Amino acid sequence: ERTHTGEKPFECPECHKRFTRDHHLKTHMRLHTGEKPYHCSHCDRQFVQVANLRRHLRVHTGERPYACELCAAK
């Protein structure tokens, strides 16, 4: 696979950054187009990547998934 060969055949036509996978290029292109297809159902925030929306949703749910290793606080 391309992961270990360093091959990056997918190039951004705007900034010429290269990617190993076509879907990485498609996600990157949203930075140039301003497209933000992932919308928060609780507020007006919009996101380029679904992972950023999932992280943002914790603001509304109060979820704090990472505990401190020293004091067990989240």
From Swiss-Prot:
Similarity annotation: Belongs to the krueppel C2H2-type zinc-finger protein family.
Name of the protein: Protein krueppel
Function, as annotated: Krueppel is a gap class segmentation protein.
Pfam families given in the database record: zf-C2H2
GO CC aspect terms: nucleus
Gene: Kr
ZnF (C2H2-type) residues: 1-4, 10-32, 38-60, 66-74
GO biological process: segmentation
Subcellular location: Nucleus
SMART domains registered for this protein in UniProt: ZnF_C2H2 (SM00355)
Chief place of localization: nucleus
GO molecular function, one term: zinc ion binding
Keyword Repeat annotated: yes
Protein keywords: Developmental protein, DNA-binding, Gap protein, Metal-binding, Nucleus, Repeat, Zinc, Zinc-finger
Organism superkingdom: Eukaryota
